[in-house]
Amino acid sequence: MAPNAADKCPVMNNAAEKCPVMHSNGVSSIQSHGPRDIYTLEALSHFNREKIPERAVHAKGTGAYGEFEVTADISDICNVDMLLGVGKKTQCVTRFSTTGLERGSSDGVRDLKGMAVKFFTEQGDWDWVSLNFPFFFIRDPAKFPDMIHSQRRDPQTNLLNPSMTWDFVTKNPEALHMTLLQHSDFGTMFTWRTLSSYAGHAFKWVMPDGSFKYVHFFLASDRGPNFTDGSTAKIDPNDPDFATKDLFEAIERGDYPTWTANVQVIDPKDAPKLGFNILDITKHWNLGTYPKGLDTIPSRPFGKLTLNRNVKDYFTEVEKLAFSPSNLVPGVEPSEDPILQARMFAYPDAQRYRLGIDHLKAPIRRKETSCKHDLGPEFDQWLSQVTSESWSHPHEDDYKFAREYYEVLPEFRSQEFQDRMVENLYKSVAQGPEDLRKRVYETFELVSTELARRVREGAEVIVADMAQPDSPERAQPGQQRL
């Protein structure tokens, strides 16, 4: 019997256009009329284009799938379909990230951490784009590029240079509150599974009659805080992906991380009585810790997020993920927070650059829905009628919130907690030139005389030691991350 012709043929692979290719692991020689190896040329051109630009911010990250379950009835304040009905479940995908540095940088850098969740609701995608702190460095979106650049690599040396950050902070005192928190143990990275995240911005939850409440929602890790007495002993300094590996391996073995969803609520008529602008993202809504003298705005738990499945293709399922705070569903509207308004433009615009104009057709985004995505009408009456704000200029509250955070730490956490924050501050400040250090001390004087003294004394001791030729403290500027 004649052998089957197919048995003599090499294994065939499909090219990009679904055409069979006989020898995908070898190149055809040049024929008398020129090269004809279309597959090799196609493979090379695809290789040259297979990567996409990294994110402008939050470039380093990882992700996983999960589900959200409603655990409490909040129908008295909320008309979002996904949140109506105890026990109702919604599938989602989550991405964790650092903020300022590039892909390949360490999970453990002392900067903001992101936790973005895309809920695949019956009415379309709803994105929670959150950070591990409930407030931010700036309230004026025009300052955002400078703020991010100040936390990146020095454009001359390509090294990390804390002086760039301190130059920004001393010129923009609204960043002091965030800077103190970032240098405390709250800014110490441990694992993604212990990261709590906060939407930060005020949103509106709108009822069917058109009334609304201002809300802050956040996800509190059920595993506790993202630090252990300031210790990072379990973190391998030689493994920049320690948190990424920890999350993946935990889900693989069935140790699913969970978060409790909480919401704080403010009635618009109560906003003028609170003593600060609730739309200023450099301030937080007091949960009962600080500032003293301001009303506590309690939180209500209403749901549980569980991550229970790892991705199979990181590039397609995580790198091509696109989040935006503008991805809302009926019953949710943005507030008038200027940073939020700017982000609602900047995120989709960044995605059009990074992923192309057809990024909404990516498989991770293909969610069928029979509901229109346009929101209800915007309301003419809003908070600006009762609260005026100059978003660019310093206010006394910029120093007050930072001052009260510093002063409450021994009671709220411990004296050692406060001491470690001060140590992190002066180690960072010490790397700057004398004129910048002086400006930092003067800025801290406006927060707390004691804080300024402690930072000055600690930094100048390090500077004096570094001046010694044989000092082990000597280092090139920019070698230590903030």
From Swiss-Prot:
Cofactor(s) needed for function: heme
GO terms for MF: catalase activity; heme binding; metal ion binding
Pathway, per record: Alkaloid biosynthesis; ergot alkaloid biosynthesis
Residues holding heme: 347
Source superkingdom: Eukaryota
EC number: 1.11.-.-
Cited CDD domains: catalase_fungal (cd08157)
UniProt key word Signal: no
Active site (record annotation): 58
InterPro entries attached to this UniProt entry: Catalase, Catalase_AS, Catalase_clade1/3, Catalase_core, Catalase_haem_BS, Catalase_sf
GO BP terms in the entry: hydrogen peroxide catabolic process; indole alkaloid biosynthetic process; response to hydrogen peroxide
Pfam family, one: Catalase
Alphabetic keyword roster: Alkaloid metabolism, Heme, Hydrogen peroxide, Iron, Metal-binding, Oxidoreductase, Peroxidase
UniProt KW Oxidoreductase keyword: yes
UniProt GO cellular component terms: mitochondrion; peroxisome
Role played: Catalase; part of the gene cluster that mediates the biosynthesis of fungal ergot alkaloid. DmaW catalyzes the first step of ergot alkaloid biosynthesis by condensing dimethylallyl diphosphate (DMAP) and tryptophan to form 4-dimethylallyl-L-tryptophan. The second step is catalyzed by the methyltransferase easF that methylates 4-dimethylallyl-L-tryptophan in the presence of S-adenosyl-L-methionine, resulting in the formation of 4-dimethylallyl-L-abrine.
Family per similarity comment: Belongs to the catalase family.
Name of the protein in question: Catalase easC
Source organism of this protein record: Arthroderma otae (strain ATCC MYA-4605 / CBS 113480)
